[in-house]
């Protein structure tokens, strides 16, 4: 069962690199929060200092004061009417003005800001990520194309990407999909429920069929395909790494893919036949079974709470995080 793997990886933990960090993670990470070593990036040095002085919610956490980019240098930060639309890319106003929320992207100030290429950040070099979470308003490709060994190490990548260029030069979902597949990743989850009304007299009469402008997606590495291509990293995936991968499959509830990987790892001698047998049923993948009955784990919501959760799900990650922080005060 997956519960045994949680014990086996306690000493190594699961390294999660959060580029565009808000300081905390979604509730979906709760079942493994005590295993997570969080490395967050926020260009606000004061906020990083504040976060680093707080007790960690996870196994460990550190926040680094860098604006991550595809290169070292100085770029322009476009400060918009809404802080949640700030970007190192200029808003594509000709396009955005067609939508009801266009005023959120009105540029109020342009400021120079130092940026760092991810492969040049010294403090990150001692880490081998298992998870990369990236929310950077259109800079996914410049950053991930420089991620090198970090992307090689990662099994799980979470992105938030536009289907169209909401910013000038923005990475679009189609471009990201090609890049991720070329690097051995497949999409396993998507939340496209970000529909925005056109800026006309019908904007306050939504039908739920408005245009989808962006989506969060989860990408998992396909070790089976990489092995068939002669690209499987025999040295980079040891017994502990294999068990981390399977725990992440359990967290994502990708039991079928997880079992395919478990069979692959068993053939490679990375898990035992007994461990494989423990994963042959859905119950064997259930992370909630790894906790005592009195220990809370994120549970399904119903009624009004479910409706509220669905409404919050329509908001960008950073805005949701701000609401959660405000409600906790």
Where are these regions (language model features)?
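Phosphate/nucleotide-binding beta-alpha loop and adjacent structural elements of enzyme active sites
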Residues: 1-329
